[in-house]
């Protein structure tokens, strides 16, 4: 390389031209008038800076590639912060020329070469031992830091765009925090493990909407101790240094070392959660539409792409050789011309040719060197990426084998528990559907990192003490408030609420369906490629379905409609709230054994339930959206109430379980009183996906609000825990008025019954050992609100359908041509012809894809839609519902616009699309 003058202390670009020095060596820097590589200049502290003088430029010299590219790091260790060390070397001063440095050469002092260049200077000592034997060079005063080539990290290691480990609790960063990705973070946190070891130090990594933790940084490449998805997690704070993350039945109790670290983590977690929710909403889809699972064809395409890239790299190498060959031939020809005797009149022309040839030689040499550098780097990184890809493939296979092996161990432990002596007499009460034993061993992570919660943590936030009605008659008289009903009266509207006899229908309904065939199918072979994905986008055979659609499942929630019929006659709004709460819980009673998924409705599919004669209601559902899949529902009762909702079901496979999250508000209005109730559904979780007996759990909080009186009911679905003293599937709640005064306490289980107890007096309890304080409610004896109907005979062979569910898919005359009863694949499955049902299901899905493409094409380029989801929403208009702004929730929701029952009466279905 040519020599370069160092910039003055007063400023200068300090290496701005460095990136082009290997291509064009005569480039002055116009912004600060300093000389770029290939020029000489002297600087002065006070006098004017001299103009750059051109220098003869030799052919660029290149050091060995091994000195320019650092070796891969063999272990993921944190790098210490670069510490600037003081040296005794004098820096360039006023009137004194700076030290001139040569380019990197083999054998020179700076031949270690990592980051060496025309504006760098060898430091007196290595910066850090954390990156192997590579030495970092200190830049001169007033110049930018020397560029440091970044070693290739192993798969699983994280790095910021600046090449600095991401800061977190307990780490130090040499880059400002503002430059780091805001939704990515890593560092040390204290995590609650168990009561024996308390909080333990763990390395946490936040990225891609997932929070994972390891015992140390060395485990990042091979062993993840746990992961929580932030898109479904709730972030809460306990104290000045605490963070609580809850997702379904999983909770992380974390502590930071300081308030600053805690705030940084909370900010990063909230940003990552918001981004994950946006991604989840953007990528939700229906069954098997445009996102197929990884197939051998995909792998073949990947290898084909890699092969093409390799061929292109070979072509580039050949072109490089040709350029070098022809350049050498041209140089030889010019040398031969110089030796020839040429007449004097041709001397000027030959001089011009020589000048142009010299310029071409300089340019071509620089291009050849740059091309050679690129080829060598590309070959090195190509091999590294090939190894990384192979490593990831091996890790995936290893992960699949590990999960399958763990699932088998889990199943064997479950069987051992069932056959163990001294089992509870009533296994259903002890929740045997889940694994009640935890595998423990020397290598088990459960020894330290399994969360153990006591009863206080899983239990309710209040304590109930039952008192006698006679003893507290005076208190009851003064505390009834809005209640006008005597609790001990025989005609209390809440007494016997669940004992209402079922209505008798004039139409004889069926009481059984064909038995479920015994088809064996490996669920893991399908689910292993679906971790973290939206299940509605994954095509699955009907073997995992039940012969009902999601629209029919929504209608099945009306099985205990008599609770609402009875609530119409309540004169007290808080008593009415008790019945509404019992109705909201009763909708989960049918899910306890229903482990099969319903059919995803086709866009425009409908389902009606016309049972005015026996149930006194009419119900209509319509699939109103394809991206994301969403269903609108409207119910009218002749007893004086109406219910409507738009529900979007988001379901994802998390490796060990499936998480089902219903999104959307449910509205219930009583015409006589004008009371308007709004609530949302809880989260459902399906466990033991890979091996073992499937079981379902409900968890989360539900708040029911009466927007007329501002009465509220707080329901809590307690998730199942191995070590909880609470009963399985327990639900608790408190009904309070607009002033926050509690009137009723609710208790029960979502699969059996619900009771309510009238509150006579409430007082705070003494603080517990953990500092938490509960409210003590003195109540009267509990009254039964709702009790589950027994299942029909032989229900275990009929998908555990209830009496109402058995009638939902029964063929009826006069329904719309889009009704779920007319769906052919669902009908074939009900009859036990599953192979034909799978073939028909594929035909319907392909027909739906074709209709979707036509809608997107009809939207046109001139439309205001920016995404495919917006285009489809803009192109498709529901037939019986319309989008309106909900004034209570502030959300857009589909509400019934009328016309269906009139069309049915006339049997005029010309407006219905042909979807089957």
From Swiss-Prot:
InterPro entries with a match to the protein in the record: OSBP_sf, Oxysterol-bd, Oxysterol-bd_CS, PH-like_dom_sf, PH_domain
Bias (Pro residues): 49-58
Expression sites by tissue: Expressed mainly in retina, testis, and fetal liver.
Gene Ontology MF: a single term: cholesterol binding
One GO process term, biological-process aspect: lipid transport
CDD domains: PH_OSBP_ORP4 (cd13284)
Subcellular compartments: Membrane; Cytoplasmic vesicle, Secretory vesicle, Acrosome
Topological type in the membrane: Peripheral membrane protein
Region annotation (Disordered) ranges: 1-20, 34-121, 139-163, 282-301, 417-448, 813-842
Modified residues (Phosphoserine): 287, 763
Pfam family, one: PH
Ranges of residues in domain PH: 182-274
Annotated Gene3D superfamilies: 2.40.160.120, Pleckstrin-homology domain (PH domain)/Phosphotyrosine-binding domain (PTB) (2.30.29.30)
Bias (Low complexity) ranges: 79-92, 144-155
Compositionally biased spans, kind Polar residues: 99-113
Family per similarity comment: Belongs to the OSBP family.
Subunit comment: Interacts with CCDC159.
Name of protein: Oxysterol-binding protein 2
Species name: Homo sapiens
